[in-house]
């Protein structure tokens, strides 16, 4: 119940829970319900809306620049400025290391190279829980709420998770 209160899923019968509006919470529940046609890797790759938007905008601006021939125009330079701003923001959000971070996290939790490309809905509940845990970890929330996270992990994955969480700089419950 405490985890659900902190996550904002339940409301307290008495008192209040205060947290900054910008506070990101990652909550791993025991009842994972994922039925995605995406591969495990794609599921995680699309889990950060800000990066997905930035990646899309970078592609759009790059495509527009490739098609233009007015290299000396103000509009062309404005697009270059926008591209620079988008690249800067993408870099600040670790966009250039995002896919590597996903693969490293999934492998740390026991997924093989082949399984990264396997559709998520073909996995058992325990493996879906690992994918959901990986999604939380790669998105680096301010607060991580874990409800029995090691239930479906083997010893190697538990050890990897312990090492990861020891380095985590946010709040962990």
Model-derived regions, located:
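ABC ATP-binding cassette signature C-motif
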Residues: 1-173
């Amino acid at each position: 119940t405490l985890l659900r209160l902190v996550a904002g899923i339940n409301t307290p019968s008495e008192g209040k829970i205060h947290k900054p509006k910008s506070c990101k919470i990652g909550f791993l529940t025991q009842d994972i319900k994922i039925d995605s046609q995406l591969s495990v890797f794609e599921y995680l790759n699309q889990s950060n809306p800000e990066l997905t938007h930035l990646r899309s905008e970078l592609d759009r601006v790059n495509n527009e620049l490739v098609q233009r021939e007015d290299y000396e125009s103000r509009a062309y330079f404005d697009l270059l400025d926008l591209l620079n701003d988008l690249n800067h923001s993408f870099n600040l959000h670790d966009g250039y290391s995002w896919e590597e971070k996903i693969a490293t996290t999934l492998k740390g939790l026991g997924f093989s190279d082949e399984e990264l490309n396997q559709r998520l809905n073909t996995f058992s509940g325990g493996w879906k829980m690992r994918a959901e845990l990986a999604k939380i970890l790669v998105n680096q929330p301010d607060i991580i709420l874990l409800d029995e996270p090691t239930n479906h992990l083997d010893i190697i994955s538990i050890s990897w998770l312990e090492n990861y969480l020891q380095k985590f700089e946010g709040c962990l419950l």
